[in-house]
Regions:
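N-terminal strand-loop element at the rim of the active site
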Residues: 2-8, 13-15, 21-64, 169, ...
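A conserved mid-protein helix/loop that constitutes part of the nucleotide-sugar donor-binding site
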Residues: 12-17, 196, 200-219, 238-239
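Conserved acidic donor-binding segment of nucleotide-sugar-dependent glycosyltransferases
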Residues: 50, 310-322, 329-335
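Short His-centered aromatic/hydrophobic patch
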Residues: 91-97, 115
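Membrane-proximal helix-turn-helix segments that form the acceptor-binding/catalytic region
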Residues: 129-148
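A short, active-site helix/loop in glycosyltransferases that binds the activated sugar's phosphate group
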Residues: 144-170, 179
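Aromatic "clamp/platform" in nucleotide-sugar-dependent glycosyltransferases that forms part
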Residues: 258, 277
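Short hydrophobic beta-strand element within catalytic cores of glycosyltransferases
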Residues: 294-298
Length: 375
């Protein structure tokens, strides 16, 4: 596994859950981190290596990708000399992918680029003209004719259509969840246990649309507190706090900050809300359902519509303040039964096996070439 650091985000948590699950099934796992940042505990037994870029030259940004690729090359070669060749390599997050694409020590047939988000929303939405053309060209250079793994079908389709990319092979594998671990952590103490409140869990980033959430909450008529678990830049945090004052809800909005264990807060909440413009998968939706907490989400590009099906689809709102407010009020007053759901498609056991299956497919890739496979 290769990733650009381990800050407190969903993709980072997925990587550690996957690594732990694979090790528990007898596999040797190495995790190469391209930054020192780490907000999560590292699983026991994981070969964890931080590859530091110590360059301080004025032109370091111009040579960053090739320089860091060379450092990664050296680390890969050293690890394989010590423990044998890797059977499978998975690169996570776009900046990591740009570096991994330049690594000559990695076999293209064994290397998969894992897409965690909707690229057009993240990288094209604010661009036009030459900037738009250049970003598309750079992205095509990374993924064209390479193995692509998507956490939802939407993220793969978006990459292919928005950037005109044809992967060598493509596969959909959902994010893994350790149900027992999530439930065990959810029974840790929670300061608001026994109170009615709704919750949002996610970093303070423009795509998460906390502004939409706050306006919808103000319009919903709900008086129970809204707890925000997450962190972001000082600028965004200041703007959000100012918006709560403008909407006259500052006394009901709790800025909890980041916590490595949000599950007690999720379990005791009466409802969890996602207000994003896009979600590659929607980890927190599954985590809430594991904790038997009803959920509301915008009907945004990505994974939420594939997670919230059947009666859960009542929790899907259009991507505007009024629809989100009305849906929040409806689910608050008439929650669906979330105690008897089949969440096995997201189990760590099932997902780990699908990753292991990629090793066999690497040995016989011809039958997958330019074909779409959903696992």
């Amino acid at each position: 596994m290769i990733i650009d650091g381990l800050p407190g985000g969903g993709a980072e948590k997925v990587v550690l859950t996957l690594a732990r699950g694979l090790m528990e099934r007898g596999h040797r796992v190495s995790l190469f981190s391209l930054r020192t940042v780490c907000d999560y505990p590292i699983p026991d037994g994981l070969h964890y290596l931080v590859i530091k870029d110590r360059c301080q030259k004025p032109w370091r940004k111009l040579t960053e990708l090739s320089r860091r690729a060379q450092l990664l090359n050296q680390a890969i070669v050293a690890a394989e000399e010590e423990g044998g060749s890797f059977d499978l390599v998975v690169s996570h997050l776009h900046k990591t992918d740009r570096i991994v694409r330049r690594c000559t020590a990695l076999s293209p047939s064994k290397t998969w680029f894992c897409l965690h988000g909707v690229f057009s929303a993240s990288y094209l939405a604010q661009r036009s003209g030459f900037s738009l053309w250049l970003k598309k060209a750079k992205t095509r250079k990374v993924y064209q004719n390479r193995n692509v793994l998507g956490v939802s079908q939407y993220v793969i389709d978006d990459l292919k259509q928005a950037f005109h990319i044809q992967p060598a092979r493509e596969v959909v594998i959902f994010n893994p969840f350790d149900f027992e671990a999530v439930l065990a952590q959810s029974f840790k103490p929670c300061k608001m246990a026994g109170q009615d409140y709704l919750i949002h869990v996610g970093r303070f980033h423009e795509t998460k649309r906390h502004d939409r959430l706050l306006r919808a909450y103000a319009r919903s008529g709900l008086t129970a507190p809204l707890v925000l678990i997450g962190q972001g830049s000082d600028e965004i945090t200041t703007k959000l706090k100012a918006l709560t004052c403008e909407l006259a809800i500052s006394d009901r909005v709790v800025f909890k900050g980041f916590t490595s264990n949000p599950y007690p807060w999720i379990r005791h909440a009466r409802m969890l809300v996602v207000s994003s413009d896009s979600e590659g998968f929607g980890n927190v939706l599954v985590e809430a359902l594991i904790c038997h907490t009803p959920v509301v989400s915008t009907r945004c590009p990505g994974g939420p519509t594939s997670i919230l099906t059947g009666d859960l689809a009542r929790g899907l709102a259009e991507m505007n303040d009024d629809s989100l407010a009305a849906t929040m009020k409806d689910i608050w007053d008439n929650p669906p039964d979330v105690t008897r759901l089949n969440l096995q498609p997201y189990s760590v056991e099932k997902i780990c096996q699908q990753y292991i299956d990629l090793i066999d497919k690497n040995k016989n890739p011809s039958d997958m070439y330019h074909q779409k496979t959903s696992l």
